[in-house]
Amino acid sequence: MGNQMSVPLRPGDQEHDPEADTYKVTSDNECVQNGIPVVVSTRVIQHYEEVDLGINSLKDNVPASSPETMEAHAVADASGKNLGKGSKPKAPAARSHFFLTLSRPVPGRPGDQGTDSSAASGRLDVSPGTAPENKDPSEHGALPVAAAPGPAPDKTPGCTEAKQQTLPATSPLAPSPPESQAEAPSRPKDFSFLNRLFKLDKGRESAPADSPPEEGKGSKSQERAIEAPAVPGNPHGVSAGKDIVDSEERKQEVDTLSYSVPADPEVLGTTKEDPQVVDATENSNSIMSFFKTLVSPNKTETKKDPEDTDAENSPTTPANLKSDKADLTPQETQGTAKSSKGSSQPGQAPSAGTSDTAREGGKEKAGPTSLPLGKLFWKKSVKEDSLSTGAEENAVCEPPVETVRLEEVESTLQTVDLTEKETQTEPTDVKVKEESKPRRTPLMAFLRQMSVRGSEGITRSEESNGKDSSCQTSNSTEKTPSPPEPEPAGTAQKNKETSSKDKKSVDKKSAAESNKQKNGKPEAREPAPCVQQPTVEVNALQTGDKTPKRSEKRRQSLGGFLKGLGPKRMLDAQVQTDPVSIGPVGKSK
């Protein structure tokens, strides 16, 4: 289109000097090419839309290209008044992006034009209006970048200036990415702002606020690019033959750059948005943690409240009931039972808080400091028949009460004393406490079982050792009761050693049997049980009737082991008549 209109103008203007000729060519190109730069810019921006956003919207292209064209037109109008001798601008409103300087082209500064980014897209499209005179396949077979640095032999006087024009036209291909980087990030962020509005991502609201300054930066960079070429001096001469082919190749290169370069800002945009997503997740996590911190002090307050409220209510409830101390325990169990039922009814949040309070309240106190809801239910239990409801609900809630009693031994002992005083009113509590007794000490029971296994061999070793010592000295009966006196103090330290000592006692059992075959005097059997009777009575007073038998066997095993060590060492040191007992005694050392 532009070529057909500019060709008839060229022969009429050839009468002028070559300078005026070159100025005329460039001015004619500008006058003819009214809408071409706008079209090319829309193509480039349309490729940005395709690569970055995947949307071909001409509505977005026109307002995006219009401020650029308006700025370029304003500067071009200001500079177009002094383009040359014969230059007469026809349509100033539709001038291209690039503009011509006042001075003649400086031959040494064609490479300085590379800083112009927005004008580069304009220069790429200016040339096709000239006449097709110098279409040399040798020069244009390759890319214009390859043809730019080496000046080929010129056929026309304007060819040197055309070479210099090709250099800034091709050299901006390298710095053209700043333009694309200035335009592309602003456009994806405009589009992503719509995405944020539709996706309702509150965490990314900071990004749209950042997009307007970046658009401002892009416009500033374009203005600087427009102002920059005025200093180094832009060549005016344009050879028609080269620029037709070069412009087509440059369009292709701009298209390829528009495919390749904006992809990087897109990645940059995604990488910029990724930390925002992370920040959004961190903000959500921080919000959840903040709610957790709000919830956890409430739990601690609810844990503290029952202690205060129950401490206030515990003396008042027996005053309302006008009963003995034993009547306080069914109320405690009723409070735990009813509060456990009531806590399941209101909702999940109170149930979670009350379960935690029930656990820690059970650790601190046995019954009364379990739940804050027990206050209300205790008032109901005062109005109702306390004993019947207590019996029914304790039958339902035996396991939690057992766990509470397992955790604290002292509270169970106190409640056992209370139930022994009045067992008729509280049969269920007695059952619960009797069941909690054997479960209370599983570790002690395990140690007792280990001690029971080795107790038989150890008692026999006691007898045999007593017999050996009676053979040696006549005061054996006096010596044998003497070591068990410090036994109760040493038993606490040696409960951990019982398992290892039981293994040794099995080895000593064979030696004890051999000694028993040699010496058949049952003299030392009596003093050891006599010494252990008071300890058995103390255990009976503390822990009841079931445990003292096992504890008696355990004490016998420890005492017998200590007794067995002393006389056998005496035998080994003095007489050494018993070779069988030397081996296990050496192991015990």
From Swiss-Prot:
The modification Phosphoserine is found at S127, S192, S314, S381, S482, S557. Residues 12-22, 198-207, 214-226, 243-254, 357-366, 418-438, 494-511 have a biased composition (Basic and acidic residues). It comes from Rattus norvegicus (Rat). GO terms for biological process: myelination. Its main location: cytoplasm. The keyword Transcription regulation does not apply. The modification Phosphothreonine is found at T480. The gene is Bcas1. This is Breast carcinoma-amplified sequence 1 homolog. The lineage of its organism: Eukaryota, Metazoa, Chordata, Craniata, Vertebrata. Homodimer. Interacts with DYNLL1 and DYNLL2.
